[in-house]
């Protein structure tokens, strides 16, 4: 389904939502039993030994699908429907920590050292910006704030219509633009060279077979060192004359390129099947992790796939990609569980799996913790985070905590004792985040119209012990972010925007509620926020803001009014001020592609000791004096208006 068509549907759904919740009482601490599976259970999933075996398996799935089509089907699997299995092993393996990134980052990532595709990155003394189908570089070395280079975010022989150029990553002298092409079919990867002076040059375009990866919360690409990582579902037609035509493959684009030029990058030996059967009534997907080595400057890729139902949420830790698939159904009157989580190691070793129930809300529902456990918040009626799936999260809430060592071939489900029943919040749009030793969650307005709730509850769960705390707030919960060793919760109460500082040491509690009158969030995605710590107890945060009462989905079509900066001093907020946009000076940019800001258009940048606001085509720099930020200059890097000026110097600065 094309994205613009989905926007209208999602908007109608959001306008029609009402608050609900059963307010489940707090339960005791989660207990993980020892001994996980049969002693002789395989530790990994089974790969296909030949192309013929894989073909036969797909034919079997086709026959099963044919038999199930007449059956009554319902969408999600209840979390309480899995039969308990033998207890799990308490053995855990040592986990790699989230090592800090050696390079300065301007991206609010989930794990340090695991970069995520975004709209702005740092390359040495340059900012690289992806905006509306074009790439831009801006010099920030020394005292500079000067546009340098601009190129289309696609090849010179490509018609960009029907393609969304969504996100970007930078590895040494390579800029990678990730998009999805409805015209050419699949993930489109543009590779560009960037030199030390920030000059951009197109290198090549490649296509990866995939279905649309878009998620309102997640990001398609990750970068760990020089390793580029993609997740994508590939929906398989087992009835096809050639079922392999939808398998992972790469094509280097050139004018006149044909589908026959795709070259498979995954042999049968890198395709895996779970021992635990799944329902094929909703179809079959190859959940594919593609890894590309960028160290040579080429696009050398390999892929690994696991077969499963189509609903999914994926999460990337420093060690593995986790893919949670959901495809449960009623057959007659009997509920059968068909949820599973796959673990696909980044070192290239074989995937493993385990049967589970329910579904996470989004990638922030996961944490692979240092003690060798996978911790996941699940809801009973979720179907994954594809498109706007995360905005329609429903059902009871549980915390799954299981040893990573309990993954095997998928033949056994997780023991019921590994799930902790949690309170279900009232409200609509569900937000969750692991911060320090706690899982935090609650509900807010999300992409809909701001609600005047007056009060809400933030639930704080100590994931290792299961202790649950309720933190009352005077506003909804639309954003949960880490702030040092504590958290900041952002949300609206009608026309006002609130920032609540939550102390997590000892008993979690709200310390400060800073209210920005007559404002709303200008960005909904995680990358719109950034916190720059100064020391353990202080720092500065930035967040795009907009006019009061603006629904969240408006950020797809309207720019933010400003970026608001707050100083944190011991969990007490002080307003530093804002750097604002000048929309009256905007000019037609001649946009040809990606003319909707699916991934946002504003972001605070704390870089090279400077404070800069990215606001559409404007970069606005500020200087903090006596606790107040003052604009010092702005540059408009738009393709038809490459001008710069200092507030104190009307003569301007030459490009």
List PLM regions with ranges:
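Bacterial N-terminal signal peptides
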Residues: 7-16
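Short amphipathic alpha-helical "recognition" segments used for binding
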Residues: 6-7, 120
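Beta-sheet-rich non-transmembrane sensory/scaffold domains
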Residues: 17-655
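Positively charged n-region of N-terminal signal peptides that target proteins for export
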Residues: 1-4
